[in-house]
Each structure stands twice: as structure tokens, then as C-alpha cells.
């Protein structure tokens, strides 16, 4: 859509009515000026373009550089009619500074013209921050504006120091921030091609830029790039690694570039692998303390493929295992504390101990409860690990803390109580004894009324009575649901399926379904693996032929569903 032209000057007025200065300033500051207009031609030929405003110190050139309708064509006309490019505003701003930090769609030609009209040719100290401010403006203000490779090259060729610092940052610090924020969701920035980014960084290095310069917080440009949450592009990161940034530099918080990435709250598996591989290939073996921090901090962070990443890290760092402790906690403690269910599954699969205590004698369940930042997920995380907990004392401790647990989802809370009543057979009786205690009743007032809580417990208790009355072969449905041994539960599979469709169980139907599916899939994958390995078991040259099939089944049942699945369907290597 064409822009509406605004005319404020009547150049045909009587000679006794001269054009006022404020009209000229308004014309250059706010009007959409056509470079072919007679008004512009009249003004540049009949008006002193270098006359300054008394307060701001603006000339016609300064005014136009702040004009939202700026065009390169009008600027060229002003430059051709003798505007002084060395005059500063009252605040000390040079015209070329305003051009590079305020104007949009500037051409390389007008930058060259303006620089060439200054006899100092950017050698004066007033221009020392010009390159830094140009790139900073594209990072902070003109986010949709491109960083012109030719302009960067010209400024460097004219002698601008690429290592000049302002507020601790160099121009490269700001450029790396631009590269990072291009991929940050919601930024709406103009894309920067990898080839162009590589050429611009190469220009800096050719002119003596320090790629590992530190800001006031001790961060190199690469530190800043990796610390931007949800921004990193694997191909851009790979390109930046070709410049071999220093991986050993620690910032003021003791973080190397890799640790900056690990603590950025968003990790891409492929980038994590790339960074570690680059370190070990170009630097050498990573110090054990850094390896430990990487693994523990990774667990606290959101990642795109957590199961793949924790498997990679545990296999890569051989001296980090399920018993390794950092700040008094095992890996499994931290995974529970930060509700990282993928990592919890993996660590338990490789024999991590869910019942191990921290150095200050806290159980994993207590760590979940104590982490108030994750309070919306507390109940769900506790529900998740209850399937692994058989210690009645731990369950009882959880029950005692029910009044203080944050309730964000009433259905999850109801399911949690049903689990507690199922696993702790003293829960209901203790609740009944305390029912009339004002202190006990008041403890529940923070998240829900006591009457509602009491109603949930009563409903769960009634269903547990029904579970105890429901027979399953030689035992009760109550005992079956309390059992965690899938091999023992196998003989009750058909009965579980029948009860799974029983509409009389409204609260415990979910737990029945979980038990049924767990046993069903375990049995299915054991059979698949047995059939797949049958040629091995029957090979006369294999010692396994000496084992009865019952023993082989016993061994297979010791594996997790995940292990059995991977044997049945080995992952394809890309």
C-alpha cells in the first residue's frame, strides 16, 4: 500500500511570509517526503540545512534521520547539498550513529557517502562504539532489521576496534545474542542464514576480534548463545563450533559453555551430544567434577529427548552411576525432586534404589514435596513413583503429610488417596480416630474442605472393603492390587481382565487397569523374546540348552518391559 504524502510547506506563499524554522524541523522530522518533490528541491536550495535547533542541537539531517518515513533517496539529496555530517546533537549523537542505530533499510552506499564526507573517516574516538551500537540496535530495537555484511566490513576496514567494550559487551557478544534469538519462539526476527553468519564472524576474526572476550559476568559470546532458552539451532551451533570457542572458560558463576547450555532450561539432545563430542575431540577428557554437574543439572532441565540423553550421558561418563552423589543426592533423588519421569524410569530400570535416603536422611517422596516450584505436579509425581515403593513406612509418612500437599487436580488427589489406602491398611482407622480433632480438621483448610476430604476417604474405604470381598482364584482382589510382582500376577491375568470391566469399582478401576496392562504387556514381551531367542536356547553349542525352559522364563521375567521391548524390536541405528 502506497504511503500518503504529507505537505506542510507552501512554497508559493508571498515573499513577506518567510518559512519559519519550526516548519523546516517539522517537515524533516515527521513528513513522508518524496525525493522528487518540488518542496524538497526548494528547501535544500533555499534553506541553511546546518542551522541547529537551540535546545536539541538538531540540524535538518538529524531531524530526518529520526523520521519514521526515512528513505535512502532523500538522505542522498541532503548529503549532496552540503549537510555537515560531523555536527553533534546536544546529547552528543553524530549523524552516522543515528543512521546506523535508528534507521531502517539503510543502504551500504549512503553509509559510505556519509563516512567519506567526514575527514576523520571514523578514526576519532567518538566513533569507537559505532560497530557495537549498530549490532546492538539490531538485537534490542530493530529486531526485524538485517545486519548488513557490507556495512560491518566497511566499519571494520575503516578502523573500528572489534574488541571495544561497552557495559562489558563487545560487538560479537551482541551478534551471538542476535543469532540465538533468531530461533527463540515469539521473537519475530529476520532469519540469518548460516553462511552469512559465518562470513560476518570471519570478518570480525580477520580484523583481530577476540572470540573469547569476557563480559562483566565472565561470559564469552558462546556462553551467551548457549544460555538462551529454546533458541539453539543444531546447524547454527555446528557452524559456531568451527571457530573453536574456548570450552574451558568459566564465567563468574563457575559455568563453562556446556554447563551454561545444561542450565538453560531447554536442551536439545543432538546439540548436547555435539557439544560433548567437540569438547572431548578438541580439548580432551572432561574433568570428573564437570561431568558430574552435567549429568545432575541435565536431570533438572527440560529436554527434547530425556530418555535418549540420560542413556547417552550414563554410557559416555563411565564413572557416573546410580550410586554417584552430588550435594548429598543420587541421580534418582534429583529426578524425583524435579519430576523427570523419563529419567526416573531409566534409573530404576538400571537398578536405581528409590528407597535410598539423601545424606540428610530424606526419602525421594520428601524431596518431591519440598520442591515448592513444582507444586502443581507434586501429586502426579508422587502417584508416578508409588508404583515402585513397597516400604510401608514411606507410605505412612506420605499419608501423614496429606493435609499439606498442594491440590491442583481433584481427580489426581482422589487417585493418590486411593493408592495410600490400598498400600497402608492403617490409614482409614487413623483417620477415623482423628476425625473429631479440630487441629486435624483445620489442617485441610488450605486446599479443600475437610468434609470433601473425608468424603473421598470414605468412598475409597468402601471400595477397599469390596476389593477384600472379591475373590480371585486363591486370593482376593485387594491382595492382587497390592502385589508388585508381575510374575506372580501373571496367573491372575484373566481374572484381572474380568474385574477391569466391572462397573462397581469406580475409584480403583484405574489401578486395576494399570495392573492388568502391566502384566499383559510383560507376559506378551516375555513370550516374544523367548520365541526370538529360541534358536539360541536350542543350539547344542550353547550352554543355555542345559537350562529348563522354566528357568529361562524366570530370567526373562527379571527384565523390565522396556528391556524386553528393545530386544523384541531393536532400535534402528541411523
Swiss-Prot record:
Record protein name field: Ankyrin repeat protein B18
This protein's UniProt keywords: ANK repeat, Repeat
UniProt domain F-box: residue ranges: 541-574
Annotated ANK repeat ranges: 56-87, 135-164, 167-213, 217-249, 253-285, 327-356
Pfam family, one: Ank_3
Organism: Vaccinia virus (strain Ankara) (VACV)
SUPFAM superfamilies to which the protein is assigned, alphabetical: Ankyrin repeat (SSF48403)
